[in-house]
């Protein structure tokens, strides 16, 4: 779940589901693609441990397994992620740019990105796991200044999602969810 719309799934409008995308996802082209807000086979923390192990097996134990948390219940979620054995945690704050969420959700749900890293740091300190847990912060990291702030507050790395899609042609008109973006 993205930090800009925690707890919600995603939807890609039918006209954006090209044949190439359909082949990759194993779905028919030209129909709405809806992604659930959660994995249907993960009902609790115990199921999450099993999923981590399944992913490790699928990659031959050669790749790290991470979890992306939409910043909401940061303290609790960080502790669960550490207990369940993820190699690193991606923490996504509410300030990420998404056109796939409603204005109400984007404006009023979630926790600001930099505040999220502070809560994560405190949660890791409470359980004595800060030294062996890597956190990648994302969601509203727009430039080098934001990245430096995040690193100074405790993030081990930052990720730039919006910058990458803008470099790819997105004009940030925030109309993804209604299919009216002029760039497609």
Give, region by region, the residue ranges found by the protein language model.
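Flexible glycine-/small-residue-enriched beta->alpha junction loops
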Residues: 1-30
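Glycine-rich phosphate/ribose-binding loops and adjacent secondary-structure elements
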Residues: 39-184
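Active-site beta->alpha loop and helix N-cap motifs at the rims of alpha/beta catalytic domains
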Residues: 2-5, 27-48
């Amino acid at each position: 779940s993205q930090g800009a719309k925690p707890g919600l799934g995603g939807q890609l409008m039918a006209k954006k589901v090209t044949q190439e995308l359909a082949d990759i996802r194993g779905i028919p082209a030209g129909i709405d693609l809806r992604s659930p807000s959660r994995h249907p086979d993960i009902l609790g923390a115990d199921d999450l441990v099993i999923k981590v192990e399944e992913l490790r097996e699928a990659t031959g134990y050669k790749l790290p397994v991470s979890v992306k948390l939409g910043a909401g219940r940061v303290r609790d979620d960080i502790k669960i992620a550490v207990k369940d054995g993820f190699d690193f945690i991606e923490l996504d704050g509410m300030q990420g740019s998404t056109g796939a969420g409603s204005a109400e959700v984007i404006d009023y749900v979630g926790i600001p990105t930099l505040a999220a890293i502070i809560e994560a740091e405190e949660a890791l300190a409470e359980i004595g796991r800060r030294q062996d847990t890597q956190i990648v912060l994302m969601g509203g990291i727009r430039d080098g200044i934001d990245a430096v702030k995040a690193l100074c507050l405790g993030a081990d790395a930052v990720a730039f999602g919006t910058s990458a899609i803008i470099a790819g042609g997105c004009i940030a008109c925030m109309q993804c969810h209604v299919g009216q973006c002029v760039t497609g």
